[in-house]
Structure formats: structure tokens, C-alpha cells
């Protein structure tokens, strides 16, 4: 086996194309904190590092735990190919977990969120092959990422806006996870009503943070168009290729952040710089580009 093959297999193990979206989710929380006070760049960076390290830990632990199942159903993965020893994955997962907690330890509240994410990773890893309800801890892992970024950069209480972006990420992640599970079981396809309803629920949840006496959902809905158009395109292509559709849904996660952040910059009293709006599309493009190198699933 070549070194290039081993590195490609490792990049696939850690689901490299999804890392930009993880960083973007955490950054969205830090950006939200910056609306009330100047952003604390070192705290934002450590929060992003914590989120990414925990994500790496989760993927390594998942592939270690599922190695026997993968030998039968995903033989192209690194452990069935015997590119690495299973113990090396477990050791690296533990190291990433501890590093993820350590980088969040400067703030007790962000440490609590990081520890919660790690706990959810363990629950998901143990249950995802046996229960469809495992999509909930997976969704909560995503939902807690903006909270990690917010609490690392702010000593203020959790705001309704933070809860809404967390809820939007929860809905999107649970939706795509349910679709991914059903595509491996042809007799359990989700209904068309669900396929069309869940992206709308995500968009409405994002925009609900901005509805007030002067701005209604009618004024705000264009900001959700990038997310909605991409997601509905992914759902359309899902009928031709489950792999393509699910990969597109994963790449589109930063567009949830974008739909949430754009109205802040458009507000007359906005303190959110337009430059902050560059992060979600950059994460989206980077993630989609990385999918050409290794798979996102």
C-alpha cells in the first residue's frame, strides 16, 4: 500500500469535507456574541479548535466502534483495508477528545458544552446502528457548536437567537441523517411531505430570530434562498443518487449559518460587519471542493 493511499483513507475517516462546516457553526456562535461586544479572536479560535477536535474524535471513535460492520458493508474504509491498527484509531480518538476539552477549558461554560458534545458523541457511537433515534444526539452535536462559540466569547446569558440557530442546525442535521439512513433501506423512504417540510422548517427557524414589528417573514425570506435552493436541488438529485444528494446536504450546512447571519448585517443598527458573512460561503465552497478528494460520508 502507498503512503498516499493511507493518507487518503485517513482523510476519509475524519470526514475531511465536513470540517469547514464544523468550524463555521462554531464561528457563527462567536459572531453572534460579537454583536453585543467586540469579538474576542483568541477565544473564537480556541472554540473552533475545540469543535473540530471533538468532531475528529467522533469520526475516529465511530470507525473504530463500527470496524466489524464496515468489514462487511464498507470494505473500502481504512480499518477493513488494514491500513491502520484499530488501537491507533482509539488512541487518536481519546487524544482528540482530551485536546478538545482542554482547548475549551479556559471558560467553564464552554467546557460544559464541549463535555456535553463528547457525551453525545459516545451515545451516538453506541446506538446509531441499532436505533433511528440516534439522529437526535447527532443533531444535538451540531446544535451545540454555535453555543460553544458563543459561550467561549461572551459572558452573557444564552439568547433566543442562539437557541434558534441551534434549533435550525438540529433540524437540518436530523433531517439529512434520517434521509441518509432511509437511503440504505429502500423500503423506508421518508415521505415527500417531510422532504419539503424540513428545509422550510430550518429556514423559518433561522429567520424567526429577526422577526419584529418592522420586519416580517415576507421581508426576510430572500435571505434563506441560497439554503433553500441548494437543499431542494439536493433532494431532487437524491432520487438519482443517494450519495450525491446526501453529500450535497452535508455541504449545505454552512448555508444554514448564512441564512441566520445575513439579516443581522442588513439591520439598520447592525454591528455585524459584512466581512463576517464571507465565512459561510467560503466554508460551503471549501467543503464541496474537498468532496472531490474524499467522501463526506
PLM features: what roles do these ranges have?
Residues 2-27:
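N-terminal, positively charged, Ser/Thr/Ala/Gly-biased leader segments
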Residues 2-8, 143, 151-297:
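C-terminal membrane-associated helical module and adjoining short loops/tails
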Residues 12-21, 85-94, 133, 137-138, ...:
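Select subsegments of transmembrane alpha-helices in polytopic membrane proteins
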Residues 14, 66, 258:
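Divalent metal-coordination and catalytic microenvironments
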Residues 22-65, 73, 97-104, 109-124, ...:
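Membrane-embedded alpha-helical segments that form the functional core of polytopic membrane enzymes
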Residues 49-50, 67-121, 139, 161-167, ...:
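Multi-pass membrane catalytic core of lipid/isoprenoid biosynthesis enzymes
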Residues 50-81, 86-88, 175-188, 290-294:
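Acidic (Asp/Glu-rich) catalytic motifs at the cytosolic membrane interface
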Residues 123-135:
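Membrane-interface helix-loop-helix junctions at boundaries between adjacent transmembrane segments
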Amino acid at each position: 500500500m502507498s503512503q498516499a493511499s493511507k493518507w487518503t483513507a485517513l482523510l476519509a475517516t475524519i470526514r475531511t469535507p465536513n470540517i469547514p462546516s464544523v468550524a463555521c457553526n462554531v464561528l457563527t456562535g462567536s459572531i453572534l456574541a460579537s454583536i453585543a461586544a467586540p469579538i474576542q479572536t483568541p477565544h473564537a479560535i480556541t472554540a473552533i479548535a475545540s469543535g473540530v477536535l471533538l468532531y475528529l474524535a467522533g469520526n475516529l471513535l465511530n470507525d473504530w466502534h463500527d470496524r466489524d460492520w464496515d468489514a462487511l458493508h464498507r470494505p473500502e474504509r481504512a480499518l477493513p483495508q488494514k491500513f491502520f491498527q484499530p488501537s491507533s484509531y482509539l488512541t487518536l480518538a481519546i487524544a482528540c477528545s482530551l485536546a478538545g476539552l482542554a482547548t475549551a477549558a479556559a471558560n467553564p461554560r464552554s467546557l460544559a458544552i464541549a463535555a456535553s458534545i463528547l457525551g453525545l458523541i459516545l451515545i451516538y457511537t453506541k446506538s446509531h446502528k441499532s436505533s433511528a433515534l440516534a439522529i437526535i444526539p447527532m443533531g444535538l452535536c451540531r446544535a451545540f457548536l454555535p453555543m460553544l462559540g458563543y459561550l467561549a466569547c461572551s459572558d452573557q446569558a444564552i439568547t433566543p437567537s442562539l437557541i434558534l440557530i441551534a434549533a435550525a442546525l438540529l433540524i437540518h442535521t436530523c433531517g439529512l441523517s434520517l434521509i441518509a439512513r432511509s437511503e440504505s433501506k429502500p423500503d423506508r423512504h421518508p415521505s415527500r411531505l417531510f422532504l419539503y417540510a424540513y428545509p422550510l422548517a430550518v429556514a423559518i427557524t433561522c429567520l424567526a430570530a429577526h422577526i419584529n414589528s418592522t420586519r416580517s417573514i415576507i421581508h426576510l425570506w430572500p435571505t434563506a434562498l441560497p439554503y433553500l435552493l441548494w437543499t431542494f436541488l439536493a433532494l431532487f438529485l437524491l432520487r438519482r443518487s443517494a450519495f450525491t444528494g446526501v453529500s450535497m446536504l452535508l455541504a449545505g450546512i454552512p448555508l444554514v449559518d448564512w441564512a441566520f447571519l445575513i439579516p443581522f448585517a442588513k439591520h439598520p443598527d447592525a454591528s455585524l460587519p459584512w466581512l463576517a458573512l464571507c465565512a459561510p460561503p467560503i466554508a460551503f465552497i471549501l467543503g464541496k471542493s474537498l468532496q472531490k478528494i474524499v467522501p463526506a460520508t
